[in-house]
């Protein structure tokens, strides 16, 4: 598996597409920090991360200082809409591929972006997705729901 991934990584260097990430953010917790750290460690570099922050009294300015590729877009709670907020972030991007994520869905490994990009290289594929794994502390019901 490692050799196959390495070969695919070499292919990506030749035909590398620009990838941006859009994340709606509201009252970010510890999972959000973990998400940002894991996005930084992806084998396929993320060009820009658009944080669509619903104003909640917290500042995300430290994210712009910590991560050079972060843009914070402040929106009011009245402006927030699940689809429209993501669309607003997507429209700011000039990337070939935009990945929409949630603030509490952390990549399980460093290959998430690479695998999504690879799936989109197929001529007959227009959309790719990854599933969110339940956390270790999730209840049995949450674990069942998350794996459906």
Predicted regions and their residues:
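A conserved acidic beta->alpha catalytic loop
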Residues: 52-61, 105-106
